[in-house]
UniProtKB/Swiss-Prot annotation:
Binding site for ATP: G169, D170, R171, Q172, T173, G174, K175, T176
Oligomeric and partner information: F-type ATPases have 2 components, CF(1) - the catalytic core - and CF(0) - the membrane proton channel. CF(1) has five subunits: alpha(3), beta(3), gamma(1), delta(1), epsilon(1). CF(0) has three main subunits: a(1), b(2) and c(9-12). The alpha and beta chains form an alternating ring which encloses part of the gamma chain. CF(1) is attached to CF(0) by a central stalk formed by the gamma and epsilon chains, while a peripheral stalk is formed by the delta and b chains.
Transmembrane residue ranges: none
Membrane topology of this protein: Peripheral membrane protein
Entry similarity comment: Belongs to the ATPase alpha/beta chains family.
GO cellular component: plasma membrane; proton-transporting ATP synthase complex
Gene name of this polypeptide: atpA
Alphabetic keyword roster: ATP synthesis, ATP-binding, Cell inner membrane, Cell membrane, CF(1), Hydrogen ion transport, Ion transport, Membrane, Nucleotide-binding, Translocase, Transport
Protein name as catalogued: ATP synthase subunit alpha
GO molecular function, one term: ATP binding
NCBIfam families linked: atpA, PRK13343.1
Protein purpose: Produces ATP from ADP in the presence of a proton gradient across the membrane. The alpha chain is a regulatory subunit.
Top-level EC class: translocase
């Protein structure tokens, strides 16, 4: 076969022209030690704090420690296959997660990957997990109500949009129940809810998701789960992932509600990370910056000013106490960061008062200005009556012969406590709450035994729904009780009193 010089030169020219000059430069390092979700890497001299790293097998990591000769990183995923000597690549990006409407109705893990078996999430928008909270100028004071549907909270510890209200109590006192009821109560409204489960059993998270689905609440809810079986880095980052997703709605002129269940477990995960990274321990072996861990998270919940779009992000963090000790390190930290707390007591819970809210220790520092006028009108008397009842009840234990006025006050107090009880998954709209508290304050319940009050309440709602719907509509729309509306309420309640038999 004859070789022709022109053909050979043609082939060589073609090869030269098609030769790719692209050169990819990536900074890599070598793992020098790994264990418990923490890797120490040598050779990443240019790494940034919080930067995303690429480990073998497609696993991500996040830079936490920058030291002279090595970098400490938390591995965000399964690290069983990663070993010493493996190569780690820098990405040049700060850790980010997917955000947007595509996530609504889904269950995702701590880095935003779907875990509900419903296929991939088609979101092209990503946001950084760690960003600064809005400044003072970008904010507005809380002035719109965030209704929970729970009589005891909406009347005496009201929450506003953009507020941070702590739910605190021992285990098994109904903390998650309060949070889940608040999510269910947003049905038909304009609030997107995010439920972040940190360090919980998978069965518990599955139960919450099935309850939300059953009540049609998953249509406007995102669930972020970092369960007890997952590594400490994932439990540490999950709340930041959740708040990043919430901020997307806040910054797009919408309203969002986020629940962290619970931050005690996040603090424990962070303590584990810090000790493994050899950071010096402080009180209760927590690192010195555990306050900053929670403050930078909760400061991202706020009500934005009209110039910034008037969106809001409301946070309900949950803290679990040990034997009612609210003066421990983490509880006092979070109490000082938030705008109030709902304190749930195990004694009340076991005595049948559910939600088990201790009204004396619970407070809302900014929610009062967000309460509807009608609720404010009836709740002022309610709080006073309950406070007097508790004082009287304490003294009544010592004396047997009580005068008529004291007996009446004790009887009224018992009925108020009874009327504030509420079954789980049954939130009540604002106008019906106002109605029943108005009836209690004005002595309509005094003639009936405490055992008949549940029946009274159910039949009262049915009576107004069927025969006095216009009064309920007026209560809902006016959101204040004027003289004419008060007269209508009194006449309707008098009519109901004649018909009701205990």
């Amino acid at each position: 076969m004859e070789l022709r010089a022109e053909e050979i030169s043609e082939i060589i020219k073609k090869q030269i022209n098609e030769y790719g000059k692209e050169v990819e430069v990536s900074e890599t390092g070598t793992i020098i030690s790994i264990g418990d979700g923490i890797a120490r890497i040598h050779g990443l001299a240019g790494a940034m704090a919080g930067e995303l790293l690429e480990f073998p097998g497609g696993v991500s990591g996040m830079v936490l420690n920058l030291e002279e000769d090595n970098v400490g990183a938390a591995i965000l995923g399964e690290f069983a296959e990663i070993k010493e000597g493996d190569t780690v690549k820098r990405t040049g990006r700060i850790t980010e997660v997917p955000v947007g409407d595509a996530l609504v109705g889904r269950v995702v893990n701590a880095i935003g990957q779907p875990i509900d078996g419903k296929g991939p999430i088609n979101s092209s928008t990503f946001s950084k997990v760690e960003i600064k909270a809005p400044g003072i100028v970008a904010r507005k004071s809380v002035h719109q109500p965030m209704a929970t549907g729970l009589k005891a909270i909406d009347s005496m510890v009201p929450i506003g949009r953009g507020q941070r209200e702590l739910i605190i109590g021992d285990r098994q006192t109904g903390k998650t129940a309060v949070a889940v009821d608040t999510i269910i109560n947003q049905k038909g409204g304009d609030v997107i809810c995010i439920y972040v489960a940190i360090g919980q059993k998978r069965s518990t998270v599955a139960q919450v998701v099935s309850k939300l689905t059953e009540h049609g609440a998953m249509d406007y809810t995102i669930v972020v789960a970092a369960t007890a079986s997952e590594s400490a880095p994932l439990q540490f980052i999950a709340p930041y992932t959740g708040v990043t997703m919430g901020e997307y709605f806040r910054d797009n002129k919408k309203h969002a509600l986020i629940i962290y269940d619970d931050l005690s477990k996040q603090a424990v995960a962070y303590r584990q990370l810090s000790l493994l990274l050899r950071r010096p321990p402080g009180r209760e072996a927590y690192p010195g910056d555990v306050f900053y861990l929670h403050s930078r998270l909760l400061e991202r919940a706020c009500k934005l000013s009209d110039e910034c779009g008037a969106g809001s992000l409301t946070a309900l963090p949950i803290i679990e106490t040990q034997a009612g000790d609210v003066s421990a390190y983490i509880p006092t930290n979070v109490i000082s960061i938030t705008d109030g707390q709902i304190y749930l007591e195990s004694d009340l819970f076991f005595s049948g008062v559910r939600p088990a809210i201790n009204v004396g220790l619970s407070v809302s520092r900014v929610g009062g200005s967000a309460q509807t006028k009608s609720m404010k009108q009836v709740a002022g008397t309610l709080r006073l009556n309950l406070a007097q009842y508790r004082e009287m009840a304490a003294f009544a234990q010592f004396g047997s012969d009580l005068d008529k006025a004291t007996q009446m006050q004790l009887a009224r107090g018992e009925r108020l406590v009874e009327i504030l009880k509420q079954p789980q998954y049954r939130p009540i709209p604002n106008e019906k709450q106002v109605l029943v508290i108005f009836a209690a304050n004005n002595g309509y319940l005094d003639d009936y035994p405490v055992s008949a009050l549940k029946k009274y309440e159910t039949e009262l709602y049915a009576f107004f729904d069927n025969r006095q719907a216009d009064v309920l509509t007026e209560l809902r729309e006016k959101q204040a009780i004027g003289d004419d509306l008060k007269a209508k309420l009194v006449s309707a309640l008098d009519q109901f009193k004649k018909e009701f038999t205990a």
